[in-house]
Amino acid sequence: MNTLVLIPGRKSLRYAGFVAGSETCTGTIRGFRWQGPRAALDEVRTIVQAVGLCDDVPDVVVHGLFGGEDFPGPAALDQDALVRLERVARQSPLHVAGLIEIARAVQEVFAGMPARLAFETSFFVDLPLRERTYAVSPDLSHKLALRRWGYHGLYHEAASREASRSWRKRDCAPSPRILSICLDAQPQIAAVMGRRPITVTSGATPLEGLPGETNSGEIDPAVALALAGEAGLGPEGANALLVGESGLSGLVGRRVRLDDVLTSARSECVRAREVLLYRMLLASGTAAAALGGVDAVVFSGRYFSCSAVVAQHVLPHLDRAGALGPHAGEWTIFAKPLETVLADTATLH
């Protein structure tokens, strides 16, 4: 089975081709928003045809960040999906409008090839009511579609699936309590019971939660109001600061990556690391409490190679608190990149 994975970003389009599960080509089309999705996809098609990916009609998988409650799982990219995306775009216009544009271009450039959409939020559609609900008026929540989401659902779902499989091989209970830690540009922690998430660190947007590479993470709303008002930044300026100039980069004073902060001996990185690891400890404790204990710990994400740094800081605290089961200290790594996780959705669903 051949699969073409497309991951549109704000400025670039990543692609990867797979034949029988093995990656045959990968690359990035930069400036694709400027040249237009049709031109970028024409370029991708030329590349994948040259390596023989189209010799056997491939499945095309398009990555989406936000799918709302309309997309509880991967969905065929057809007219019905586009109608639903238009509806979802009212909730998250920044995330979805560009996806609609590229989805239409996929239908044109890869006409006749089966295509599907896979969303990061799908895994979190069924978060428990107590977890997804904000303490504001239900009428207002409904009107504005306010609720909590997770934004690394593809990693969390794949990692917890593998952790559950390993757990069952031990002849243990069928629904392990999993602490899933995704180490990415915007790190995220989720508590998963078997295959269902019950808590997650992010919220209505990725701004809530742990500090990221440029994202402040959870912050008192009054701070945002002060930045917009007293500091004179205005709403757009405050948002730009909290989303693009804060987090680990804000603490260090220059643009940094998560792995730099977790491994560097520079004093400014050490300070940022202390803040991040403390927040991760608190979030892990919350997840463990919600689960009633932890049977398995699994790491995933772009920076999974830094898992040991986090594990050595967080897990001893959980163990002393009596939150870890007999095998939870034997943490594991789910090392597949996002491109492979997306390719797997073509066969798993």
Model-flagged regions — what are they?
Residues 51-99, 113-116, 121-133:
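Short beta-strand-loop/turn "lid" adjacent to the catalytic site in phosphate-handling enzymes
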Residues 6-39:
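Short glycine-rich, Thr/Ser-proximal phosphate-binding strand/loop in the N-terminal lobe
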Residues 46-59, 166-171, 284-295:
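Phosphate/pyrophosphate-binding loops at sites that engage ATP/ADP/AMP, CoA/4′-phosphopantetheine
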Residues 126-230:
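Glycine-rich phosphate-binding loop of actin/hexokinase-like ATP-binding domains
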Residues 295-317:
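Glycine-rich phosphate-binding loops at beta-strand->alpha-helix junctions
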Residues 158-162, 166, 271-292:
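Phosphate/ATP-binding catalytic cores across multiple sugar-kinase/actin-like superfamilies
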Residues 305, 319, 323-349:
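Glycine-rich phosphate-binding/hydrolytic loop that grips phosphoryl groups
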Residues 230-274:
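A mobile "lid/hinge" subdomain adjacent to the ATP/sugar-phosphate binding pocket shared
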